[in-house]
């Protein structure tokens, strides 16, 4: 059985040894993995840590504001927000292949961190990599942004959570005193909404994806399902379908809903969701997002599917 206190003590000591009194940055995403890694590193090296959050433009609605409030104002971390939306979206123009998207995002993430590190004199990059990240990458299922590091990297990498699974990381978060909204926050992919937009990422599809995910989260979090589901989200498919709005024929985008239960993300199943809730979410999406004509439900388990669409 996983014991949090011995792990915390050993991890802090190991982080301190690996960093060896050098200035350090951490890739802070706002999720539980990077949050736990940040707190452990802060306890190990204190003011030598700079938490860096990159706004790629691919994050959830109001994400940057929430990150600042939680990690800077509430938790007191030394936090720097890097506005990089234009860089990421420009590089992703015309890219359709999901693996290519992930590799581009991974490369840009590290380039941004390296630039900040050079400006601040940093030498070490801490990441919130957990076991499913590198297990999936080595099995060539998906390449996660915090594994596909480009050649010639100038920063040493420290991954204090590399051998842990999500349920263990959540236990650590509670033991470390992290806010409940972080400790029990649903996982969010490193590449952000890029993997929930099938095909090319356009401003139109990105806006749809942000709003649809906001609606899904808002409705689920009104119910007890928020404590039962591993993930709940919406994806924008790379196809359009015919619909009717008013008395006028409409040909527009299709949004897919995804709800899964899991313990460690290695396997997942689709639980039964109250149909009236699904209908409510569907109605909100099609009425509040003008360029969506249809909402579908994905009920595929993992395996054979992965949790995210790309």
Swiss-Prot record:
It comes from the Archaea. Pathway: Purine metabolism; GMP biosynthesis; GMP from XMP (L-Gln route): step 1/1. NCBIfam families: guaA_Cterm (TIGR00884). It catalyses: XMP + L-glutamine + ATP + H2O = GMP + L-glutamate + AMP + diphosphate + 2 H(+). The lineage of its organism: Archaea, Methanobacteriati, Methanobacteriota, Methanomada group, Methanococci. One of its GO terms (molecular function) is ATP binding. Catalyzes the synthesis of GMP from XMP. Keywords: ATP-binding, GMP biosynthesis, Ligase, Nucleotide-binding, Purine biosynthesis. This is GMP synthase [glutamine-hydrolyzing] subunit B. ATP binds at residues 29-35. SUPFAM superfamilies: Adenine nucleotide alpha hydrolases-like. GO terms for cellular component: cytosol. Heterodimer composed of a glutamine amidotransferase subunit (A) and a GMP-binding subunit (B). It comes from Methanococcus maripaludis (strain DSM 14266 / JCM 13030 / NBRC 101832 / S2 / LL).
């Amino acid at each position: 059985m996983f014991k949090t206190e011995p792990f915390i003590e050993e991890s802090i000591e190991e982080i301190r040894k690996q960093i060896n009194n050098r200035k350090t940055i951490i890739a802070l995403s706002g999720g539980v993995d990077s949050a736990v890694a940040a707190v452990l590193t802060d306890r190990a090296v204190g003011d030598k840590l700079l938490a860096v959050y990159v706004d790629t433009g691919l994050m959830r609605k109001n994400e940057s504001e929430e990150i600042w409030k939680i990690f800077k104002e509430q938790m007191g971390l030394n936090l720097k927000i890097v506005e990089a939306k234009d860089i990421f979206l420009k590089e992703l123009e015309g890219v359709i292949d999901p693996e290519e998207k992930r590799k581009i995002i991974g490369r840009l993430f590290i380039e941004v961190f390296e630039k900040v590190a050079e400006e601040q004199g940093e030498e070490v990059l801490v990441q919130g990599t957990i076991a499913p990240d590198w297990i999936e990458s080595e099995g060539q299922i998906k390449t996660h942004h915090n594994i596909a590091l480009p050649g010639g990297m100038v920063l040493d990498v420290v991954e204090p959570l590399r051998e842990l699974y999500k349920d263990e990381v959540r236990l650590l978060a509670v033991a470390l005193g992290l806010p409940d909204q972080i400790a029990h926050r649903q996982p969010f992919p490193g590449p952000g909404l890029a993997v929930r937009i099938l095909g090319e990422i356009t401003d139109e599809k990105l806006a749809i994806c942000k709003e649809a995910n906001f609606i899904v989260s808002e409705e689920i979090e009104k119910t007890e399902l928020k404590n039962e589901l591993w993930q709940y989200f919406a994806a924008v498919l790379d196809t359009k379908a015919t619909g009717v709005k008013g008395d006028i024929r409409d040909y527009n985008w299709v949004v897919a809903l995804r709800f899964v239960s899991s313990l460690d993300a290695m396997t997942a199943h689709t639980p039964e969701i109250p149909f009236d809730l699904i209908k409510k979410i569907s109605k909100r999406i099609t009425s509040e997002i003008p360029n969506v004509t249809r909402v579908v439900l994905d009920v595929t388990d993992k395996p054979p599917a992965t949790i995210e669409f790309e």
